C-alpha cells in the first residue's frame, strides 16, 4: 500500500482530475491512500517554526510504526526514474507500506524529516504545491510501469 500525505489541498479542477487519473491507473497495482492535512494559517502563529510543528503533529498521527517514510525535500537525494522504481519494487514486493510526505508552502518541520527513512529531491527548482503532487503521482505510476515492463517510460 502507498499512502500520500499532503499539506494543503488541490484547488484547481484540472489538477484534481490529473491526480484522480493517476490514482485510478495505479489502483490496478496497489492501494493508494491520500491524506490531506489542512495548511495552517500563518497569522495564527508567532513564527513559521510553530506553524510547521503544528502541521508535523497532524502528519505524524497518520504515520504508523514500521512504515517506510519518504519525504520530499529540496536537499534530498535525487533518483532516476529507474532508481525510484527499484525503491517501490523493494518495498511493495515485501508488502511494506510506503508513506510519501509532501509539505506545504512553508516546507516541513525537522521532526518529519527526522522520521523519514529517505529524503528525495525531484529538483533544486521550486514547484507549486498542487503541481508537485501530480509529479509525485506520475513518478509513482512511471515506477510501476517500469516494474511491470509496460511501455510508458522511455
Curated annotation (Swiss-Prot):
Chief location: cytoplasm
Protein name: Ribosomal RNA large subunit methyltransferase H
Name of encoding gene: rlmH
Pfam families named in the record: SPOUT_MTase (PF02590)
Entry's Gene Ontology molecular function annotations: rRNA (pseudouridine-N3-)-methyltransferase activity
Role, per record: Specifically methylates the pseudouridine at position 1915 (m3Psi1915) in 23S rRNA.
Subunit-structure text: Homodimer.
Catalytic activity: pseudouridine(1915) in 23S rRNA + S-adenosyl-L-methionine = N(3)-methylpseudouridine(1915) in 23S rRNA + S-adenosyl-L-homocysteine + H(+)
Compartments reported by the entry: Cytoplasm
Ranges that cross the membrane: none
Keyword Metal-binding in record: no
HAMAP family from the UniProt entry: 23SrRNA_methyltr_H (MF_00658)
GO CC terms: cytoplasm
Keyword Cytoplasm among record annotations: yes
Amino acid at each position: 500500500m502507498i499512502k500520500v500525505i499532503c499539506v494543503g489541498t488541490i484547488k484547481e479542477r484540472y489538477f484534481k482530475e490529473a491526480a484522480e487519473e493517476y490514482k485510478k491507473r495505479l489502483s490496478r497495482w496497489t492501494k493508494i491512500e491520500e491524506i490531506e492535512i489542512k495548511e495552517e494559517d500563518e497569522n495564527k502563529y508567532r513564527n513559521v517554526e510553530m506553524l510547521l510543528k503544528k502541521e508535523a503533529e497532524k502528519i505524524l498521527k497518520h504515520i504508523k510504526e514500521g512504515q517506510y517514510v519518504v519525504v520530499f525535500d529540496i536537499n534530498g537525494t535525487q533518483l532516476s526514474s529507474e532508481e525510484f522504481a527499484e525503491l517501490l519494487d523493494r518495498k511493495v514486493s515485501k508488502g511494506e507500506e510506503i508513506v510519501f510526505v509532501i509539505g506545504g508552502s512553508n516546507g516541513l518541520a525537522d521532526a518529519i524529516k527526522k522520521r523519514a527513512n529517505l529524503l528525495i529531491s525531484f529538483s533544486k527548482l521550486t514547484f507549486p504545491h498542487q503541481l508537485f503532487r501530480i509529479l509525485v503521482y506520475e513518478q509513482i505510476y512511471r515506477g510501476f510501469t517500469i516494474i511491470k515492463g509496460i511501455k510508458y517510460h522511455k
